[in-house]
Amino acid sequence: MTPTGTPRVCEVSILPIALSCLFSSSAARTKGAKRLGTGPAPSDCIRDHHAVKATVSSPDGPRYGRPSFHFGPPTALFNKSLAILKHDLEHLENFTPTEEHMVPALQLVASATAFFEKEDQRRNELEKILPAFLGQGVKWRTPIAGGSAKPNGILLEGSFACLIFELKNEPGLEGDPFLQSLIVYDKIISHEVSFRSPPVHGPAAKLPLQYSGFITQSNFPVVLLTMAGNYLVVSTAVYTDAVYADKLLSIDLHLGSHGPANVLRLARVFMAIRNCTDTLSGYYRRLEPGSRPSVMYPSLTADPPEDQTKIPQLEYIAKVDRASGIPLSIVDEDDECHGIYLAKRTCSSTDDTPAEVVLVKFTSTYGQSAHRLLAEQDPPLAPALYSCNRVIGGLYMVVMEYLPDASPLHRFFPPSPVPYSLKADVIREALKKALELLHARDHVFGDLREPNVLYSHEGDRVFLVDFDWVGKHQESRYSPCLNPDANLGVKAWQVMEKVHDEANLQRLMTWLTGE
């Protein structure tokens, strides 16, 4: 309810649409998984520039930041084990290695810094050392996924990969081991009958496992460990609406003046990795075939983890279109990049989030105080803000009111107009008031554009949204990644000023009225 007593969210009208989107997305995800492994062998995908470009630029290519628009939400948002690994790697001082860790750590540094004439010789040396960190269950050069992939090393729980290890003799020779490990991961996901490694309890251990039976039950979290000479990289990956991967840590292994500290750090890194693979093993042991569409959506861990009770318990319904806020049945390339969802509070939630459908946004920065200021006006000038908490992945989880009857201004014009007219005077006065309130507290909104102004024909209401860029007058700066096509009249990294908001209000009204 609004402060004036009028309902804003019609749960009955939005849920059938959103649920339809959920099951359509799940079906699309299953079909997409079958396409993942249809490309060349992993080693062929990285053999030269053209192969790499074709692999990562394809519609089903992995999202890890190349090209620049091929990225998505952090993998830590989707699995607690991966989130804890990221947190642990950022807080290595919490680990206290024993002699059992330090001896192989020194051996690994010495081996990594040595030169080998052939890659096989380097691999043979590492096969003797890595089990001390990863356990004896690692399979070396074992064909998997029907023989379509043969990783240097793989740690399996049943048929599921907990860790994939790829190696190159030296950096720059024979391709990128990180990308190769991602293609191996693609092959594993897409393969209909997955390799199952005994022992598994009971006679089922000898039966082929239909991987498709789990495609709607898991987002298949995995650790990717890669080495090229003395360069080691720790990464993670998941499969939701696409394959997403993050490089968490890169280390140049060497001794020198800081040898003891470098060896200690490496031992701690592998302690964190082992903790993660152990918990992933437990996760995969508990999996059963079935359907759980929530695997496409975040499963969050608070930052720090001990603040977990602050995270609202939500049931995610659909990803939404960034430009319109409409639930998506098919997630296209543009919408793969963001983390904006519809959700509903679960019955077990103990926070103040209301029971109706809410909008959940993940962002690296957020102007929480500015949002609350406008949301608490009567009538409100922004959607109600229910919570704003840090989660592992370096993001804020922002939970706010969802306004299905309000649309961004550009939606009232062709090519897909909303069948209602706008009242320019109402919009002008509401935005002037919003800016006056913000500027009185030295806030600069910083992103006053058509998509960030919602208009509802019910009561002629106007709402500002997207407080990611809010900054302090003459102190904060615009993003260094500012898109010049945003038409904000400012430059990247320019100092933020109130006059910029005022100029953009004038520009917006000129666009709206043609005057």
Segment roles from a protein language model:
Residues 77-215:
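A short, conserved, highly charged catalytic patch centered on acidic carboxylates
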Residues 457-515:
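C-lobe/activation-segment region of protein kinase-like
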Residues 2-128, 270, 275-278, 282, ...:
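Charged, often low-complexity linker/regulatory segments
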Residues 439-456, 464:
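Catalytic-loop of the protein kinase fold
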Residues 317-380:
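ATP-binding glycine-rich loop module of kinase domains
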Residues 261-330:
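Juxta-kinase regulatory segment immediately upstream of eukaryotic protein kinase catalytic domains
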Residues 363, 372-428:
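Conserved structural core of kinase catalytic domains
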Residues 154-164, 344-356, 459-461:
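Active-site beta-strand-loop-beta-strand hairpin of nuclease catalytic cores
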